[in-house]
Amino acid sequence: MLKQVQKGFTLIELMIVIAIIGILAAIALPAYQDYVARSQMSEAFNLAGGQKGAVSEYYSDKGVWPADNAAAGIAATVNGKYVNSVVVSAAGTNGVITATMKSTGVAKGVQGKTLALKGTANDGSFSWECSSNADAKYLPSSCRNAATPTPTP
């Protein structure tokens, strides 16, 4: 009589594979969630950054920072898929562009958070300092630096 050869995986082999997949998922899921939050926060940085030219130009022409979006010559409502609003304001000797994230439909770590670009005039050029109440790991790398110079438009 010939013995039958068993084919396939044993139960212990399948359990080991499932355990390995679980460990990999436990590592990958938080990293993916952080990636999603960073990509959503970059929309706020890009929308706010897109207003720097208009705000700088207003200051160059008038010698004061614009009080609101209308004064800066930008749309009253600036928003995006993840950004609720982008608002221009004057704060003392600085111009401020503030982007506020939506409260729903965005990653939990950035819900309702704000990102502000504070402009300072420096003898014909401007520097922009980025600040946010969101965790630094969600901010674009260029926003983690103290100030980035912007030439006069």
Swiss-Prot record:
It is found in: Fimbrium; Membrane. Disulfide bonds join C130-C143. The chain crosses the membrane at residues 9-29. InterPro entries: N_methyl_site (IPR012902), Pilin (IPR001082), Pilin-like (IPR045584), T4P/T2SS_Core (IPR050470). The modification N-methylphenylalanine is found at F9. Residues 1-8 form a propeptide. GO terms for biological process: cell adhesion; type IV pilus-dependent motility. The keyword Disulfide bond applies. Keywords: Disulfide bond, Fimbrium, Membrane, Methylation, Transmembrane, Transmembrane helix. GO terms for cellular component: membrane; type IV pilus. It is a single-pass membrane protein. Pfam families: N_methyl, Pilin. Belongs to the N-Me-Phe pilin family. This is Fimbrial protein EcpC. The gene is ecpC.
